[in-house]
């Protein structure tokens, strides 16, 4: 679990997302409160429930990006799901529980990686011995002896192995055969039975190893993973993973506005309202049966987000509104925000294009006037057509760089300066013509 302070979390989010300080502060506080809760005594800890968040804002302003970055910062089980997935044809009520099953799978993977990292030193030693055994096979008469022959020759090879002198040498070694993935088609609502059948068939499969020829460098990596996996206790793994989900799990529900009953429609809207009612027990707290064990959702943090262009937060059923007490509004982006998005974030769009062109030997420089004009063009198209926020920058940049990207392989060693004149020459007609910008940008 992350021990970062709210200020540190916001600072980290600032390096990837421009603006939206209110949303950043809310998720930072929510994440820090997870840590604060764990410092309480057990009795009080059970009473402190997470304050779920509803993020409201137009498309392309950073709602999903905040979730993506939060997943990396949290160091906790995290899953992002689209609420619209549960309104599809064939939907039945039990399917929402798949959210918790997927979250538990993520926790198992996270816990396994942590435990394997702790065993890495022992795994490296075991992998080293197996490679030395392959390089220096024992004589037939010594196969029954338990004591490993640690002669001077073995020590010489051990030294060479550690120094990387044998990395390119090929050896034949037994590697555990990967489990065969079995796909089972089942109707909606039968996910639990499907996962149990898959586990049963996989366990029935042979656990035999497969002899493969590869370089020592490749074999060493595979053997470390194999030996580390052997050192992980599966029962402890499941127990820790379930504890991790229950105490630190985070679920991001995207597009929640799409399961609202539309304000201007009459009559029942069974599918959408049904999804909301089935989400209620998860958000409020219930017990879900997973293949790893029973998981309680009482302390899982839910962050919901939606554009709410065709509906309002008040169109959600009252019970679900009550389970999302913290409301955060994200603001629409201005031309100045677009300018900052192009330059300030880590691995910004302009940095990406400069790096891509550099692989062809073409130097690209973005001038201040060029960046301003790109931002202005993207903002103008958003104003005249559909406002899709910062995603418009991807379309505009791709259109702007199209000619250069096509010709880059023939221009190795050249320098291209992208200033206002360059942008106008490549984009002005499209931006000015509303019909063209509607279909092309």
Curated annotation (Swiss-Prot):
It is found in: Cytoplasm. The keyword RNA-binding does not apply. One of its GO terms (molecular function) is proteasome-activating activity. It comes from the Bacteria. One of its GO terms (cellular component) is HslUV protease complex. Pfam families: AAA, AAA_2. Transmembrane segments: none annotated. ATP binds at residues 18, 60-65, 254, 319, 391. Keywords: ATP-binding, Chaperone, Cytoplasm, Nucleotide-binding, Stress response. One of its GO terms (biological process) is protein unfolding. The keyword Oxidoreductase does not apply. PANTHER family: ATP-DEPENDENT CLP PROTEASE ATP-BINDING SUBUNIT CLPX-LIKE, MITOCHONDRIAL-RELATED, ATP-DEPENDENT PROTEASE ATPASE SUBUNIT HSLU. A double ring-shaped homohexamer of HslV is capped on each side by a ring-shaped HslU homohexamer. The assembly of the HslU/HslV complex is dependent on binding of ATP. Belongs to the ClpX chaperone family. HslU subfamily. ATPase subunit of a proteasome-like degradation complex; this subunit has chaperone activity. The binding of ATP and its subsequent hydrolysis by HslU are essential for unfolding of protein substrates subsequently hydrolyzed by HslV. HslU recognizes the N-terminal part of its protein substrates and unfolds these before they are guided to HslV for hydrolysis. This is ATP-dependent protease ATPase subunit HslU. The gene is hslU.
């Amino acid at each position: 679990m992350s021990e970062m302070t709210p200020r540190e979390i916001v600072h980290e989010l600032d390096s990837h997302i421009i603006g939206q300080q209110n949303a950043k502060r809310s998720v930072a506080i929510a994440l820090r409160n997870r840590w604060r809760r764990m410092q309480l005594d057990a009795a009080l800890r059970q009473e402190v429930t997470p304050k779920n968040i509803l993020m409201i804002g137009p498309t392309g302003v950073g709602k999903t990006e905040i979730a993506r970055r939060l997943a990396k910062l949290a160091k906790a089980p995290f899953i992002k799901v689209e609420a619209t997935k549960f309104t599809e044809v064939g939907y039945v009520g039990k399917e929402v529980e798949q959210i918790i099953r997927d979250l538990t799978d993520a926790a198992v993977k996270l816990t396994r990686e942590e435990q394997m990292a702790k065993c890495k030193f022992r795994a490296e030693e075991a992998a080293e011995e197996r490679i030395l055994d392959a390089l220096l096979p024992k004589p037939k008469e010594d196969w029954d002896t338990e004591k490993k022959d640690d002669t001077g020759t073995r020590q010489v090879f051990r030294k060479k192995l550690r120094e990387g002198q044998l990395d390119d040498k090929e050896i034949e070694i037994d590697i555990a055969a990967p489990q065969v993935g079995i796909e089972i088609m089942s109707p909606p609502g039968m996910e639990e039975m499907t996962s149990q059948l898959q586990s049963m068939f996989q366990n029935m499969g042979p656990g035999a190893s497969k002899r493969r020829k590869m370089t020592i460098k490749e074999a060493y990596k595979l053997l470390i993973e194999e030996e580390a996996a052997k050192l992980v206790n599966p029962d402890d793994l499941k127990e820790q993973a379930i504890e991790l989900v229950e105490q630190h799990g985070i679920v991001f529900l995207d597009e929640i506005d799409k399961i609202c009953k539309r304000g201007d429609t009459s009559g029942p809207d069974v599918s959408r309202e049904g999804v909301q009612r089935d989400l209620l027990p998860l958000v409020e707290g219930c017990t879900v049966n997973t293949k790893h064990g029973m998981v309680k959702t009482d302390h899982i943090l839910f962050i919901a987000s939606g554009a709410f262009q065709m509906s309002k937060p008040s169109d959600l059923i009252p019970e679900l509104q009550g389970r999302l007490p913290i409301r955060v509004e994200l603001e629409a982006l201005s031309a100045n925000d677009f300018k900052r998005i192009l330059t300030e974030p880590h691995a910004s769009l302009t940095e990406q294009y400069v790096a891509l062109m550099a692989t062809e030997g073409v130097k690209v420089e973005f001038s201040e006037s060029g960046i301003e004009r790109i931002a202005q063009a993207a903002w103008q198209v958003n104003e005249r057509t559909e406002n899709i926020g910062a995603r418009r920058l991807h379309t505009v940049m791709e259109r702007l760089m199209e000619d250069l990207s096509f010709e880059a392989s023939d221009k190795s060693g050249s320098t291209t300066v992208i200033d206002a004149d360059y942008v106008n020459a490549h984009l002005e007609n499209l931006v000015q013509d509303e019909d063209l910008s509607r279909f092309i940008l």
